[in-house]
């Protein structure tokens, strides 16, 4: 397999050596972006953290059908799917767990008090996304609970032209997908809508699914000083869950989930002050059956709510930029297994960005204070440091504490294979990172070393294969890692090309973890290499190829190659995709085998 990797990389670089750059045209495509997943708006090139950006143009060029597909092309992002089309998937960053990663949509936090298994249920469709901001490393100081190892903020489109599209897609395993997108804009505001349905017979016994997705966003701009943005979304999923949970032998499991979001937010400026208030409500519903045809044997019902309000304020002064904010919310759950429970929480943030020597050096110390009605109060400080070595090179580092309180599943869940633990303590970690970034349009490159010294990590462990999985605060675990990524758009003749390479290495020191079997924490990627290449063959024909190599300490490594061809003619686009080109045999989690080579064909019409 290593020879395939070597050959693939050599081929990619051989293309790039033929490049004839047109810097002016490419720089128009790579204009500066202000990163919004922080309390203080900072240009991407001036940020002192490891942040990846995926633009709408990159998403379109990759032919990614879902956000899950796009994230799997980023080194350090471990998406563990059960099945296809992202129907059930968990998100891990830099060796953390799915409960340690926070998802946001336009800055709205979507943490789930029941379990992080449902985080990706809220993902919006590709068609409404402006960009994806991936914050690697601890972000709890900035974003609060659950951003233990990182966060992903999906920024949806705010400015667009009137129009729309319809798309039909079909392929292997009886996959059928239909969607409608509509956009309208005027001087008083704009509105976009997405409706889609995706279904399949399944790639093996009891892996069929039916998914429905609705996403609505409107902007009201009659008052230029107080523009209002409204988001409403709903995702419903019904799927066979052969071996997804419990054990690989549980072949007749079934699950239905719902994810709903409503949010209202605005942004206003008064002098050097900027205010960003928002209110939000999220709802999750989960219905699980151990035997699909016989619900009486065992079933779980869970309904969660989170309602809150937040305010981010920034002040620009002679001393730099100050960011302050708060988030007040109430979460609740009604469950036949976990019980009826609720908690109130208040989070307060404070940070200040100092700059020295004409912005050559910047320091951003900050602290987050949390007040929980059931877990007490906590304060976690941290600092980011950046040194601009030249107009292209930037050295950065950060040091800080991060945390996560247990989910209701961690605390109270009980079934024939798993036991919760009401005596669990919050997870804590001290994080260190040192990175170097090169940013010279069109080439972007960064490398980083990071270390996480975690205490009281929550994992499900057991002493023997016959024992029950029990939620436990395992002892300290030190994770060290190295990461690099390169993004290089260029031209061959007048045809646009885009090359992306990434690699992450992780090492967990488990010398103080005296457990024989671990469900989550001791199965991170050890080696993770990603590569993608997009080439414009003609003015209307484009070809994308993506490669992922992954190796976990307890499993054999595997290589997955996906490819697609996009042909545009008039107002139509025809896309043919082939996934798992090598027909690799592998699993991403829970010993659930992933599908072999499969194809999809889609036709889209723009109007």
Each language-model region and where it sits:
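Gram-negative outer-membrane beta-barrel transporters
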Residues: 318-319, 323, 356-357, 451-453, ...
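Outer-membrane beta-barrel signature, preferentially recognizing the C-terminal barrel domain
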Residues: 246-269, 394, 401-455, 462-491, ...
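Structural signature of Gram-negative outer-membrane beta-barrels, strongest in the C-terminal barrel
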Residues: 232, 266, 319, 337-454, ...
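Short acidic/polar hinge/loop motifs at secondary-structure boundaries
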Residues: 108-136, 155-157
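N-terminal periplasmic "start-of-domain" segments of outer-membrane beta-barrel proteins
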Residues: 29-60, 90
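Flexible loop and strand-edge segments within Gram-negative outer membrane beta-barrel domains
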Residues: 200-207, 211, 221, 225-306
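Extracytoplasmic beta-strand/coil segments of soluble accessory domains associated
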Residues: 68, 72-108
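Short strand-turn segments of transmembrane beta-barrel domains in outer membranes
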Residues: 151, 156-184, 194-195, 200-207
